[in-house]
Amino acid sequence: MRHKLAGRKFNRTSAHRQAMFKNMAVSLIEHELIKTTLPKAKDLRRVIEPMITHAKNNDTVAARRLAFARLRDRAAVQKLFAELAPRYQERAGGYVRILKCDFRAGDQAPMAYVELVDRPVAE
């Protein structure tokens, strides 16, 4: 039975799902704004928020290695610890905002923007 199992399968294997969310997390850290489907956006929040909290609470070599093990991208780990952790030092969670936008043209899937709150806006 499927009682109280968290997360969605997205019709993918567990390795594919893990790789998809790793790639999405790296893209979100790099660009600070991405567009994806609404269910993926909701599950991405469960991946990225603990990473930011962990980076914020302890900037050690072990914490950086754990982040690198999950992201596999040196630039993303550097930005996570150098820019994002200090930015959210005073914020107790809620680092990600999900904004519903339109529906995808091909299959009418609900789309959403995922952005990091308090991000600098280009003028």
Curated annotation (Swiss-Prot):
Superkingdom, taxonomy of origin: Bacteria
Pfam families linked to this entry: Ribosomal_L17
GO annotation, biological process: translation
GO MF: structural constituent of ribosome
Subunit-structure text: Part of the 50S ribosomal subunit. Contacts protein L32.
NCBIfam families: L17 (TIGR00059)
Entry similarity comment: Belongs to the bacterial ribosomal protein bL17 family.
Protein name (Swiss-Prot/TrEMBL): Large ribosomal subunit protein bL17
Organism from which the protein derives: Dichelobacter nodosus (strain VCS1703A)
Gene label: rplQ
